[in-house]
Amino acid sequence: MFNFALRSARRLLPLGFLASALGAQSPRADSIPLPEHPRPDFQRAAWRNLNGRWEFAFDPDDSGERAGWANGKLPAGHSILVPFSWGAPLSGVADSADIGWYARAIRVPDGWRGQRVFVVFGASDWRTTVWLDGTQLGTNQGGYTPFAFELTPLIRAGSDQRLVVRVDDTPHPFKLEGKQGYGKARGMWQTVYLEARGGDPLESVHFTPKADLAGVGVDLRLRDPAPRDLTVRLTFTNRDGRPSVTRRIAKGGAAAHMDVPLPNAHRWSLEDPFLHDVTATVEGSGLGADTVRTYFGMRTISVVDLPGTNYPYVAVNGTPVFLQLALDQAYHPQGFYTFPTDSILRDEILRARQIGLNGLREHIKIEAPRKLYWADRLGVLIMADVPNWWGSPDSAAFREHEFALRGMIERDYNHPAVFSWVMFNETWGLTTKSGDRESYLPEAQHKVASVYRLAKSLDATRLVEDNSVCCGRGHTETDLNSWHEYLPGWRWESHVTRLSDTTRAGSAWNFEAPYRQGRQPMLNSEFGNVWGYEGSTGDVDWSWDYHRAIDAFRRHPKLSGWLYTEHHDVINEWNGYWRFDRSWKETGLGDIVDGMTLRDLHSPLYIAVGDPELSRRAQPGESVDIPLYASFLSGSSAFGDSLVLRADVYAWNTLGERRTCATIVRRVPYRPWMSAALAPLRVTMPDEPSVVIVAVRLEDAAGTVLQRNFTTVIVEGEPRAEATLADGSRVRVARVGATAVRDAHWSLKQWNVLGDRKMNGAGSGFFEYRIAWPTGLDPKSVAGATFLVEASSKRLNGKDRDSTAAANDDYMRGGGFHDPSRNPNSYPMTGSKPYPSAVIIRVNGVLAGRRELADDPADSRGILSWAAQPHDGHLYEAGSYGQLLRVPIPPDAISQAARSGQMVIRLEVDEALPGGLAIYGAKFGRYPVDPTVLFVLR
């Protein structure tokens, strides 16, 4: 395991490859889905996978048991692919009823004679009853944790027998559901298998590393009290010498504890996620041995102060970790709760690591063990939620919750990646309705506190959070002082400042009375712009607001981490790093600062650059101080006492030229865990209207880039009528506003954005501009002319259609808009599926050329579009921008313009490729360019 983990840490798979694999590796109809053992953390050698085709029948009127279906004969003609929930596309069965019956033949191998045989269900939602050859084996009520029934007395080894399963998933207000509105988990949704066990099998083997990491405590539990004296043996199979330890369990005992010294044990960490492989065997005279292969990570989870401060942080092995997490809804478009292949499940974890995150929050879903296994192997922390119910806080609901909580901790105790258990989310299911009010009553708060204490009694080695709070609710007893907030990017700096000022031991902020803050790490546990704008955003460029938030977080070291919503899109939220099909989204960062990626925004060594807005305004020639803040959240001493800061300042001007302004190199102080403001950069602005980018690189002494960042400055002023180009050519300049069209017609729609900032035409059609010949310009002095414009294709988004459709139901339960472009704030972010168009340019009736328009993009490159956004709770095509078109104007068209006194410039989109056209003005898009004619002078 260790060797694989190291290889994986050194090799980054292309994310495009990972995304394409999502669909490419779905199971074939003739194969067994998910053939791997579902419990790498607890597996026996003799097992048989029961995934695959089962007979299936719905039971809408609950008559199947009376009709004798338990004996194995279901109505003929239907089948389902296990372990996919009915209703999930991969199951092959539509969601038509609340009760489903499964049946199949099983054959226990002859070689299993003399052993106890069990059928094991990874998870089945919700009330599951099982029969073998008509004999009922038992019933399990719960949808998220494993259970098993013994077949031994009924087994006819080597012969076919009928296994029948009935699952009742009838809705109840107390039933745990989480966000199954994205796709219901109905019936069996994890691997089902047969397993041969010894005479008194192990029920659990839990490893608890000692605080000094020099040994491990081991707690073993048997399924039944020992019928005679038994011996338990542990063998550490990948430790030098394969050491073994043994303990005796006396007759009648059902548990054993061992303290095993492991001096100089290899530790588990995010950088080196080593796993200790262990074989546990229990045996006794005349009793078949039971052997389980398992593993653990030698690591501790605790809370320590950030060195040099009294700010509490989560720590792994005593070293603070600045948490950079993503909310993982853990949904697959074809399998819902169940991912089609193990490699796709692995890649979910790998994606997070590749963009520089150090953890995921498995959101109100108890995730499949193999996903946790991959987190263990790849070194990604897991915050694990218990699913919620949607009804009232009654005793039935709390019983369901406790059953799931106990099962989750029992199953997942050995996963070193799991650092915290989250009991409740946003007080869902905990409020009592009285009229129009939803109240979080003291009795519910006390119950939540008791659940926290229960979890701590079950697992004292991890952090426990009572309630991941939001929306005015507070904590009770908790190990983490977390909070949710969804804000526009411009509000983050003031918000985090206020929270930092109110975070201290004894503070009442973020807690329900009479509870108070103690020494809990303060962290954000959900953020994003998705709910930061009125009515949600739909699909938008999240990267600009994200950048502003991360800069704000890094300026405030009391904040011990953050958690972005979300890893991937779902059916009604589109703010994921990846889309629901796991195709990539483009941030545009690498076009602004060469080599910059999301990893730079997640770097342990971080320089926050510029003002909280990420864009400020200045006048031509003004000297501007650019603030710098160093957030060095690393204990590394490899860099000495200083690092190199390199700032490259460049600008785009009104002629569409990129001009280099300055390069500034300085040394900045370094010490481990340093958080401090640095001396600002003083930058002189260009003497003309421009978009200025201050691109910063943090380097070590060898020139290795450690982090990249940037800020922008909009230099205002009147553009020049005469100028000199970068190649020395002198030009006269004539311009017109983007919306100053003299004629236009579009097959679908035409509209403006923010008054005169941008002009859109959807479908096929044209815009026609008339640009006057410059006063006093002698035609004989003109050597040539070029038309300059920023343009893109223009998709007709759902919000742009003339429709009065409203969002439906509750977003948290799958409601809302299911069109990513329908929300009034939406403008789909640049991604892997471009929206092309093409524009034909004619000047005074003469063909000047055709240009391909690659896309209708929106990302961080739309600097001016973001700078133009009003602070009114809405977005107006934020981040959208075009490509810079330079179209030489034919001499005949220039001559006609000289005679007529104007250039008639027509931009046409043909109906053969009706991809629309957007024209950007000088205060919108990427470049400070209006539709412009450059007359090159002789």
Regions found by a protein language model. Name each.
Residues 25-120, 171-181, 185-188, 306, ...:
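Extended carbohydrate-recognition surfaces in non-catalytic/accessory domains of CAZymes
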Residues 132, 215-250, 256-258, 623-668, ...:
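Beta-strand-rich binding/interaction modules
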Residues 40-41, 57-59, 92-93, 97-202, ...:
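Accessory beta-strand-rich segments of carbohydrate-active enzymes
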Residues 186-206, 299-316, 711-743, 928-938:
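Low-complexity, Pro/Ser/Thr- and charge-rich linker/hinge segments at domain boundaries
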Residues 156-158, 221-306, 688-713:
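Extended acidic/polar, glycine-enriched regions
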